[in-house]
């Protein structure tokens, strides 16, 4: 099953079900119904009609946003004369596409570099305060609602620092937000340099081709015209009059959905090195869109290929192959997986700006996979609980000065273990927890820790030990970032995850100015809220609190599995 840029390898039975789904969509006019924003493409319940039909503004973005390219380029010329660095303050859909664009395209000569801040760990915030010349830094405050707790906490910290320096702080900020949001009002009151208003009918994870993605991209000198024109090719290939069987987006959506129906729901990405960050954006789109009502597709990203034997029957693979990259290792591994009978999609890219096509293709595919699964791919019904529980902890802190922390079940040196265990021995307790895993499950490592290469390396080792020992998919993410990406899947899927949470002491904490809390308090409350939310949803979860040398502790915990 092949097209010029996309090859699908699978059993005859799977390929037949995909073709049958495409024929059904043709018969039911699914393409026209998508463009007519017909909510019955996903749900028959009238109470969901507004939520569904009001979230399809992304369909015409590639053609629509080309009208704003010159305006954005003019603004980029203004910015590059005044600033050496850009720091984007945002979470989830507001931050993932900009991060992918910078890691993929880099910065053009003469343009500022981009840093995405999406960690509330005080060490992550301090790194910017200590290492950046704030007078040469432009801050992008990026939030659809304008009320994202993490984003606004970042804003207060940097606005306060600039105010204390004697500068006119508003000159160092721009906002990207929805019309009528509290952030739009704040930007007016604080006299931000500029505010970009995005269409409200585009959900956060579908917003890569709105100002949320395009403004940061143009400010680093990326060719947003090429990005949009490439995306427009898929838009035209998925329009009302499209022959569905010729649309790569519809075909990929049918493939994702049909595999999920036969319990193949773990999707591992192998990606040429030059575009290695792209699956981080896909991860949120797929996980948050499909992980609900006991269903879901689990993306597995940023891991090296393993032997064929370490993958379960629930696995399938997407291979992004960029022309002229060194793809030798991936080519060999993918051939072995195909020969072993695993479903595989190979997507061929000619250059980096083909990402524009792929962004739009995945939006179409994810929406249509939602149609197969009969879910609403545009809501996130289970996200609010963790926020509510976190806010309750924060309110308790503001009243008493103390967070309602749980008493550890086991303490071993500088490692505290939370949960209920038969054994009081840390090794036995951890192995007792992981032994609950059965075929079709996955592990999710959730690290409310500061970013560092050392910690990344240790978490990667833990992932590989778990994968190779249990032959199950293993995902990982930093908190609170993952709460805005895979958090919905964790609480909304069919209870297939086993969750390993890491937290740490708030060393060298930092107050959020005039808010009555610190970044250390905030990230601790967020970890506590997610722990409670997972438990309230009947999830299997273990939490390690680490003091001192984080890398050494994670390595020790990994050794407990040997």
Language model features with spans:
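Conserved, well-ordered active-site substructure
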Residues: 480-516
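Glycine-rich phosphate-binding loops that contact phosphosugars or nucleotide phosphates
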Residues: 74-242, 316, 320-325, 331-339, ...
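Structural beta-sheet core signal
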Residues: 88, 139-141, 175, 268-269, ...
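Anionic-ligand anchoring segments at beta-strand to alpha-helix junctions in alpha/beta enzyme folds, i.e.
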Residues: 82-136, 268-309, 468-477
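C-terminal amphipathic alpha-helical interaction region
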Residues: 379, 384, 399, 403-405, ...
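Extended, charge-enriched "interface" segments that sit outside catalytic cores
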Residues: 1-77, 324, 332, 346, ...
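Active-site phosphate/pyrophosphate-binding segments
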Residues: 161-316, 327, 361-473, 484
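Short, solvent-exposed amphipathic alpha-helical segments in soluble enzyme
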Residues: 103-106, 130-134, 155-158, 189-191, ...
